């Protein structure tokens, strides 16, 4: 009888909720909810700081965001622009192509922009952003070839840890950026912040051209004539790879047909002593785009410029950028594509 009474009391205690039992069951739930709440608050605060103070980021990040969020989303062309030219590439293009000087080499009606990105050789993301904003070019100039990668699969995207991380936590580098900003500002925070803003606005006003003076090796912004580094190959020509098949190539062809623009691969720039001079253009270079009527390759792989035209080992200074832009304008004019 006593055993049955004990079992009955136990069953009754299980069926009837009590304060003590509720607290025991709810403890894990409350802990999880508390963690999620605190994590959400921290995320909101850090994201607010990241958004409110964009000029504390490195110059490359500021330029990248400004080109995607401000430049290509604005109205780039007018009805008077008969030839609308967008130039793509990496940081060498960012520092090397001066749109206003390029346009001045032609009759009125040519309008160009520098869409070179720092530390990023991708073509499609910023081209698609420009097209989505209604900025349709007549000519797309590529200073670097497309890659040979196939179309990314869902598994490829899931393996891209860095992209996923930056999507979920865009302020991942905020602590590093704050420390770097304090170190470079010498505690002149307002002046340093305003300087970054002015550099961004200057880049936008110059239609995407940006002198990367923060990486210059000498105060003058020029390298000495005998400058060289161990990785140079002054007697070797390293031809750039121009794949005949790739996802980017297929997308460029699809977009060129849909929007009616031409895609042209043009020469890049190379510092003297870094590599040997590139041979003149020949018919073999056009084999890769032989099946694409709206695409062509003109000029050599690159042009050679003296070290004095470079601010660091790879990026042109303003004088070098003017030289490269002049050569590019001459090549484009001789090709007849803007006639």
PLM regions and their residue ranges:
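Substrate-gating cap/lid alpha-helix
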Residues: 256-259, 264-298
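C-terminal regions of proteins
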Residues: 280-339
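Membrane-embedded segments
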Residues: 88, 92-174
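Membrane/wall-proximal cationic-aromatic binding patches
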Residues: 42-111, 118-122, 128
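Second-shell loop/turn segments in exported
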Residues: 87-89, 113-117, 235-243, 270-276, ...
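N-terminal Lys/Arg-rich, disordered targeting/topogenic segments
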Residues: 1-30
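Loop/turn elements at helix/coil->beta-strand transitions in domains of secreted/extracellular proteins
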Residues: 82-83, 108-111, 136-139, 257-264, ...
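Secreted/periplasmic serine-hydrolase-like ester/acetyl group-modifying domain
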Residues: 155-259
């Amino acid at each position: 009888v006593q055993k049955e009474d004990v079992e009955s009391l136990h069953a009754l205690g299980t069926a009837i909720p009590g304060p003590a039992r509720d607290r025991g069951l709810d403890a894990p739930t409350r802990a999880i909810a508390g963690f999620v709440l605190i994590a959400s608050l921290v995320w909101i605060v850090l994201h607010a700081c990241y958004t409110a103070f964009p000029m504390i980021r490195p110059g490359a990040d500021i330029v990248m965001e400004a080109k995607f969020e401000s430049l290509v989303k604005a109205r780039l062309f007018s009805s008077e622009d008969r030839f609308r030219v967008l130039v793509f590439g990496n940081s060498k293009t960012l520092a090397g192509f001066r749109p206003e000087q390029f346009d001045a080499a032609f009759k009125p009606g040519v309008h160009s922009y520098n869409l070179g990105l720092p530390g990023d050789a991708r073509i499609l993301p910023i081209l698609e952003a420009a097209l989505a904003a209604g900025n349709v070019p007549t000519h797309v100039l590529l200073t670097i070839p497309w890659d040979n990668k196939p179309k990314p699969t869902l598994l490829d995207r899931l393996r891209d840890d860095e992209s996923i991380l930056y999507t979920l936590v865009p302020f991942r580098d905020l602590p590093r950026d704050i420390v770097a900003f304090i170190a470079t500002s010498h505690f002149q925070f307002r002046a340093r912040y305003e300087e970054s803003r002015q550099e961004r606005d200057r880049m936008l006003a110059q239609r995407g051209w940006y002198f990367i003076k923060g990486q210059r090796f000498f105060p003058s912004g020029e390298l000495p004539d005998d400058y060289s580094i161990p990785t140079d190959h002054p007697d070797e020509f390293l031809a750039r790879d121009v794949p005949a098949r790739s996802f980017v190539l297929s997308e460029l062809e699809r977009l060129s047909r849909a929007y009616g623009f031409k895609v042209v691969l043009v020469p890049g720039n190379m510092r003297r002593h870094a590599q040997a001079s590139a041979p003149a253009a020949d018919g073999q270079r056009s084999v890769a785009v032989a099946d694409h009527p709206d695409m062509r390759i003109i000029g050599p792989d690159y042009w050679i410029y003296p070290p004095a035209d470079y601010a660091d080992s790879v990026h042109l200074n303003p004088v070098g950028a003017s030289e490269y832009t002049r050569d590019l304008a001459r090549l484009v004019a001789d090709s007849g594509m803007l006639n």
